[in-house]
């Protein structure tokens, strides 16, 4: 189990617990529930300026415990 910190452009920070084997799409579903957002499909996550694709695992993107991700809405 890892804990990932997600920041939006308004300064809101959310800690999300997940598995490193989870796909980005699964992570976005958990995140949307925590944020109270209607749809995970409206969420875009970035790490170091690169957009994370839904079908790739967090582990493949080298997202580890304590990693910061940027949150955007489309």
Curated annotation (Swiss-Prot):
Q: Which Pfam families match?
A: ubiquitin
Q: Which UniProt keywords apply?
A: Ubl conjugation pathway
- The question of whether Glycoprotein is a record keyword is answered with no
Q: Ribonucleoprotein among the record's keywords?
A: no
What superkingdom heads the lineage? Eukaryota
Q: Which InterPro entries match?
A: Hub1/Ubl5, Ubiquitin-like_dom, Ubiquitin-like_domsf
Q: Where is the Ubiquitin-like domain?
A: 1-74
PANTHER family found in the cross-reference section = UBIQUITIN-LIKE PROTEIN 5
Kindly provide the name given to this protein in its UniProt entry: Ubiquitin-like modifier HUB1
Organism this protein belongs to:
Kluyveromyces lactis (strain ATCC 8585 / CBS 2359 / DSM 70799 / NBRC 1267 / NRRL Y-1140 / WM37)
- Name of the coding gene: HUB1
